[in-house]
Amino acid sequence: MTSSAGQRISCNVVETRRDDVARIFNIQRYSLNDGEGIRTVVFFKGCPHLCPWCANPESISGKIQTVRREAKCLHCAKCLRDADECPSGAFERIGRDISLDALEREVMKDDIFFRTSGGGVTLSGGEVLMQAEFATRFLQRLRLWGVSCAIETAGDAPASKLLPLAKLCDEVLFDLKIMDAAQARDVVKMNLQRVLENLRLLVKI
């Protein structure tokens, strides 16, 4: 792979927000499929990849977006003045910014479920490594509460972002998306060589 291609698909420079504020698009409670026990999953917004099969396409853009649900639209035209005036809720905002303190308060509401089920908190996306500094600080706080931590990641970021975060986790759900280097580069926009090297480093932790 040429250095220019590596730059094009890198997520080295994507992280632009302050490290005490994250951009998320959902908090899902009572999940049974994102790690051990009952888990609360925080979905981070923003992903450097373009997987055709993406389960959360609303997570790809790092921007806060507004979408219209056609089935809810009354065709009243009030949105022409201001989308926030929509009486039927046809307009939905995808994404919001949240502080460390606010997110900690939000997930700790579920602490009783974590303790009784052996569950905890999973950080997903999008791609959590695009907001690695925030995620690391957040998991450090959860560790002080004794909460089990996990991340779900495609692993396509510098090891300096991945490894400090992974060392705070009880589980790393590593989403190895594709094993063909050309398709990884051209279709998914992924640096497969870096992904595999990060996986090798993870298994040594």
Report the location of each language-model feature.
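Acidic/glycine-enriched edge-of-secondary-structure segments
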Residues: 88-95, 182-188
